[in-house]
From Swiss-Prot:
One of its GO terms (molecular function) is dipeptide transmembrane transporter activity. SUPFAM superfamilies: MetI-like. Coiled coil: none annotated. The gene is sapB. The chain crosses the membrane at residues 8-28, 41-61, 82-102, 117-137, 150-170, 180-200, 249-269, 289-309. InterPro entries: MetI-like, MetI-like_sf. This is Peptide transport system permease protein SapB. One of its GO terms (biological process) is protein transport. Belongs to the binding-protein-dependent transport system permease family. OppBC subfamily. Pfam families: BPD_transp_1. GO terms for cellular component: plasma membrane. It comes from Haemophilus influenzae (strain ATCC 51907 / DSM 11121 / KW20 / Rd). PROSITE patterns: ABC_TM1. Involved in a peptide intake transport system that plays a role in the resistance to antimicrobial peptides. Residues 75-303 form the ABC transmembrane type-1 domain.
C-alpha cells in the first residue's frame, strides 16, 4: 500500500508541475515578462516555480494589485456556488434517478429520461440570460447581481457570506439570510440543471441494471417489498459508484460557473478570469489557471481517499504491487 500511496503522491506532483509549466508559458505571452528568460529559460522557470511555492503569484497588469489577495477574494464566491449546486444536484438527482429506474416503463420515467438528455444538451450561456429575462418579466423576488445587497455589511470570516452571516450579532439577520438566498437562487437554478440531469442518468442506468439482476428478481419472488430491495441491493450497489464521478461533475459545474458568473454578475473567479482575458492580463490568467487546476486536483484526491474508505474493492488497486 505504501508504494501505491507514493505513486499517487508522485502523480499529483506531476500534475502540479504540468500546471506550473502551463502557467509559465501563459506568463511568457506578456512582453513585460520577457526578463524571465533573458539568461536561460530553465533558470526563469525555476525562479517562477520558487515564487509559486512561496505563494506569490505576482501582481495584476492593470492596477498592480496582489494576485494572491485577489484570488482569495474571488475564489470563495465560485466555490460557494459550486458546492451549493452540487449539494442540490445530489438532493434532487438521487431520488429522481431511483424513481425513474423503479418505474422505468411508466410515462413519468420515460419523460424524465428524455428530459435528462435534453438538459445535458442545453447551452448554459443561452439559458442564463433567458431565465434572467423570464424572472424580470414574472417579477420573481430574486436578485441577479452580486452575492448580497451592499447595504448589508457582512464581515468576511470564511469568505462565504452564507456562512459568515451566522457569526453576526445583528437584529436584521433574517433579512440578510433572505437577501443572500435571493441572490443565490438564479445562478444556482441555472447551474443545477446540468449536474442534476447527469446524476439522474448515472443513477438510473446503475439502479436499472441492479434491478434486472437475478438476485433482485429472486427477492421479488420471495415477497420482498420494493423498499427492502432498494435498501438491500440498489442503494448499496449504486451510491458508492457515484462517488468517483464527483470530480467530473465538479469540473463540469466549475466550467459552467465561469459562464454563469459573467451572465449574472456573480463576483467569482470565472468572471475575473474572463475580464483578465479581455484585458490581456497574462499574470492573472496564469494564476487563475493554476488555482482552478489545484482545486480540481484536490477534489479528485479527496474523492479517491473517500472511495478507498467506502468501497472495499478499490483497496485492491491500492494494495497492488
Amino acid at each position: 500500500m505504501l508504494w501505491s500511496v507514493l505513486r499517487h503522491i508522485l502523480w499529483v506532483a506531476l500534475l502540479l508541475l504540468v500546471l506550473s509549466l502551463l502557467g509559465f508559458v501563459i506568463l511568457l505571452r506578456d512582453p513585460l515578462n520577457a526578463n524571465l528568460v533573458t539568461q536561460n529559460i530553465y533558470i526563469g522557470y525555476f525562479h517562477y516555480l520558487g515564487t509559486l511555492l512561496q505563494g506569490d503569484f505576482g501582481i495584476t497588469y492593470n492596477g498592480g494589485k496582489s494576485l494572491m489577495n485577489l484570488i482569495l477574494t474571488v475564489l470563495p464566491p465560485t466555490l460557494e456556488l459550486c458546492f451549493i449546486t452540487l449539494f442540490l444536484a445530489f438532493i434532487f438527482g438521487l431520488p429522481l434517478g431511483i424513481i425513474s429506474a423503479v418505474n422505468s416503463e411508466q410515462v413519468f420515467a420515460k419523460s424524465l429520461q428524455i428530459l435528462s438528455y435534453v438538459g445535458l444538451s442545453i447551452p448554459i450561456f443561452w439559458l442564463a440570460p433567458i431565465l434572467l429575462y423570464v424572472a424580470a418579466l414574472s417579477h420573481w423576488e430574486i436578485a441577479a447581481i452580486g452575492q448580497y445587497n451592499l447595504l448589508y455589511e457582512i464581515k468576511s470570516i470564511t469568505g462565504f457570506p452564507v456562512i459568515d452571516m451566522w457569526f453576526m450579532e445583528v437584529p436584521y439577520r433574517t433579512k440578510i439570510v433572505q437577501n443572500i438566498l435571493q441572490h443565490l437562487a438564479l445562478p444556482t437554478l441555472v447551474l443545477c440543471i446540468l449536474p442534476t440531469m447527469e446524476i439522474i442518468r448515472i443513477i438510473h442506468q446503475r439502479a436499472e441494471y441492479i434491478l434486472n439482476q437475478n438476485f433482485s428478481k429472486v427477492a421479488t419472488t420471495r415477497g420482498w417489498s420494493k423498499w427492502k430491495i432498494l435498501h438491500q441491493y440498489v442503494f448499496r450497489n449504486t451510491f458508492p459508484l457515484l462517488v468517483p464521478q464527483v470530480p467530473r461533475v465538479f469540473t463540469l459545474v466549475l466550467t459552467q460557473c465561469m459562464l454563469v458568473e459573467t451572465a449574472l454578475g456573480w463576483p467569482g473567479i470565472g468572471r475575473w478570469l474572463i475580464n483578465a482575458v479581455n484585458e490581456q492580463d497574462y499574470n492573472s490568467i496564469a494564476a487563475g489557471v493554476i488555482v482552478i487546476g489545484v482545486c480540481i486536483i484536490l477534489i479528485d484526491t479527496f474523492t479517491k481517499i473517500f472511495t478507498f474508505i467506502l468501497d472495499p474493492f478499490k483497496k485492491k488497486g491500492w494494495y497492488a504491487k
